[in-house]
Amino acid sequence: MSALTESFGPVPSAKSKPPAARKPWYKLLYLQVLVAIVLGVLLGWLSPHIATNEWVKALGDGFVKLIKMVIAPIIFCTVVSGIAHIQDARKVGRVGVKALLYFEVVSSFALLIGLVVGNVVQIGHGLGATGDAAAVSKYVKQAEAQHSVDFVLNIIPDSVVGAFAKGDILQVLLFAILFGFALMTLGERGHRLRDVIDDASHAVFGVIAIVMKAAPVGAFGAMAFTIGKFGPAALGNLIGLIAVFYITAALFVVLVLGLIAKIVGFNIFKFLKYIKDELLIVLGTSSSESALPQLMEKLERLGCSKSVVGLVVPTGYSFNLDGTNIYMTLATLFIAQALGVDLTWTEQLTILLVAMLTSKGASGVSGAGFITLAATLSVVNPALVPGMAIVFSVDKFMSEVRALTNITGNGVATVFVSWWENELDHDKLAAALNKTIDPSDIETAVTTG
């Protein structure tokens, strides 16, 4: 029995029953979200006084909070169930080591690419800007908790209830791993509890299916407020930084992640099309966390092992943030160039090493990349911290691409680790990416079981 069948019931199959009728185009989630984003942009551009109303902003914030509401129970149920179904405890450790090794190698590439592009393009050179420390002081304060020792200690929750209440991914993940191992050691005595957790996972994904119906509303509110508050004219000379970041992130996905996909045996563009719903939701909310539950489910349908999905995806949301990594090195060089500060190669190497640590403190929440940037600058060269105000006004426009790159990177990482573990179902992979299985059937599988 497949991992998906164990979690969500029988999967619709063309061999077992006639294929379901295709949904009308106006009921397709990704089209609804896309239309909502366009309408949000128009409202923010044409009527910024309406778009910046707190109730419009609440539409986007409310949707993200609804998603975050169920992330902790989803991670707990998925990880515990995945580990409890494994008979060999050594396998969990093996998967974890492979995932972390992958994260470090790919994250290093992302950081290095941002550093190289920043030196070649020199987009901040000659700007002659000055920074405003007050504008970014709250981010610097939050960044104080991002140093390596505090980061490690913060993984350990003061209480299990507190970890769930705060929705801290790494704390919930730590408890879930320990609980899963404990359940696995119980043997047959733990089967009933394991089945209860499997059923709970099914129910929580049902909640997600309900919440996702509000995705277009959330995307509309978030995009309208963003455009209304900052507006196209607010970009000014910083449009160059945004363009360079967009192009760099796109090239990273196509070339680096594309090469990894080729090694595994699939096409990166087909993969992007497969997760288009999740990408559009992330685009509207600028938070990769908003698509975490759906991404995990789609990866299982893609043929990835349930145990690998349960371990790699939640961990990747803190340890494998490719878009954030590119942003940190590129933005650091931009700020230094804008302030007229010449960084030596030794200092730039320090940026690379420090960012490898500070980036691990970033979560999938919108704006977390700005906090990790503050952490990096405060360690490398405190004189650069006030310069964060230069990119503050346009950070929101880069946040979306950071989140899109992050979620794509985590998806590819999960497929790669499953392939590395010889637990990737290539038949499912080919069927899903070649549309033999319609991704829209996921909602049916969740809601009907």
Curated annotation (Swiss-Prot):
MF terms in GO: fumarate transmembrane transporter activity; malate:proton symporter activity; succinate transmembrane transporter activity
Region (Disordered): 1-20
Keyword Cell inner membrane found: yes
Pfam family, one: SDF
Matches recorded under Gene3D superfamilies: Sodium:dicarboxylate symporter (1.10.3860.10)
Family matches, as NCBIfam families: PRK01663.1
Similarity comment text for this entry: Belongs to the dicarboxylate/amino acid:cation symporter (DAACS) (TC 2.A.23) family.
Protein name: C4-dicarboxylate transport protein
